[in-house]
């Protein structure tokens, strides 16, 4: 599986695509606010505060549609440096960005502009949004701001981006194959175990078939352990 963070080419491209996604979200939800949007091993993500709006499959489809529009428009991406005071003024309506800026040392801060969207970022980025056209948003989840359960929940949207459509399709095929091998899917499809949110998702409960399978190595251990101890 591709490591997007380690591959410099994919790292830059996916970092840029995260900004395209943020711009699309801002078009659809003008009141949206943004925390961080890094590249990780699996691609990229952005943590977003959508207020009372929740992310679902329809929202993801709408964001992807707007992203395709932005990519097709081929917006030039520019890097510029501003002072910390200018950054605080520029992002004065986004408390998440203000929190990030407050944590930076005094001096110039880099931002990236693409069309009507500006974001705080170290970079680097590609020079045009059209280079981000081969993307896919792959999953979403709720996360606590800064990973602190005492904070409110933000929406984290994950995606991947490749230089070519062929590379994207090949990667999506690998993800689909991995999903088919996932023990959670296999367990559900074969009726081996179930999970209950009231008990805890990390505490699966065996169903009859699963219990039978689990008993096999347990029984074998009971039969062979005395022999092993005598050796």
Indicate residue ranges for each PLM-predicted region.
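Conserved short loop/turn motifs at secondary-structure junctions
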Residues: 9, 45-54, 84-88, 205-213
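Non-catalytic interaction/regulatory segments
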Residues: 1, 40, 50-142, 148-163, ...
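N-terminal catalytic cores of NTP/NDP-binding nucleotidyl/phosphoryl-transfer enzymes
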Residues: 2-31, 35-38, 125-127, 203-215
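Short, conserved phosphate-binding/catalytic loop or strand-edge motifs used
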Residues: 39-45
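Core alpha-helical transmembrane segments of integral membrane proteins
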Residues: 179-185, 198, 214-220
């Amino acid at each position: 599986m591709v490591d997007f963070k380690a591959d410099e080419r994919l790292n830059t491209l996916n970092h840029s695509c995260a900004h395209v996604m943020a711009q699309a979200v801002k078009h659809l939800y003008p009141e949206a606010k943004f925390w961080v949007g890094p590249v990780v091993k699996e691609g990229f993500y952005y943590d977003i505060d959508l207020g009372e709006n929740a992310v679902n499959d329809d929202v993801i489809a709408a964001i992807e549609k707007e992203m395709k529009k932005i990519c097709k428009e081929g917006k030039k991406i520019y890097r510029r440096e501003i002072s910390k005071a200018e950054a605080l003024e520029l992002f004065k309506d986004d408390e998440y960005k203000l929190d990030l800026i407050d944590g930076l040392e005094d001096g110039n801060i880099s931002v990236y502009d693409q069309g009507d969207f500006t974001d705080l970022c170290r970079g680097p980025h590609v020079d045009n949004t059209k280079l981000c056209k081969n993307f896919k948003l792959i999953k979403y989840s709720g996360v606590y701001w800064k990973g602190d359960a005492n904070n409110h929940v933000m929406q984290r949207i994950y995606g991947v981006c490749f230089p070519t459509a062929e590379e994207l399709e090949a990667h999506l095929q690998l993800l689909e194959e991995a999903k088919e091998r996932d023990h959670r899917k296999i367990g559900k499809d074969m009726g081996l175990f179930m999970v209950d949110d009231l008990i805890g998702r990390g505490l699966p409960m065996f169903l009859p078939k699963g219990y039978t399978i689990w008993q096999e190595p347990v029984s074998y251990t009971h039969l062979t352990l005395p022999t092993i101890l005598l050796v």
